[in-house]
Amino acid sequence: GEVEKYNVFQEPEHGYKEQVFYLDIPAVKDNCSYAAIFNRKLKLGVYVKFDREAFTNFSEWKMMGEGEYVVGMEPATARPEGRKKARENGELIMLKPEEKKVYTFEIGVFEDEKSLGGI
């Protein structure tokens, strides 16, 4: 099925239907997780590194269609199904009046697969 192909990026496909994959990415170092895509032909990659405790969910949005070839790597505090569903799942974060919450993450590029381990 398609679930096993979440990390496969094929040629653009006519009629491809966009998909969202929910990934449980474990913390690797300093409670951070990361996701990356690397194009061996172009020798170019992009990564997102995030605090696993703050960002409890991660979605990969994938569209491999002709003229619409894109992927989104999306750390989040809830799944992208809306506030109602987040409330039902106990994931909706409510801030008190004037309360602030800061979330940080890192996005970067790399040119060598081996350098990914140093992120």
Model regions: which residues?
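Active-site/ligand-binding surface loops and adjacent short beta/alpha elements
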Residues: 1-47
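Active-site pocket scaffolds in enzymes
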Residues: 36-119
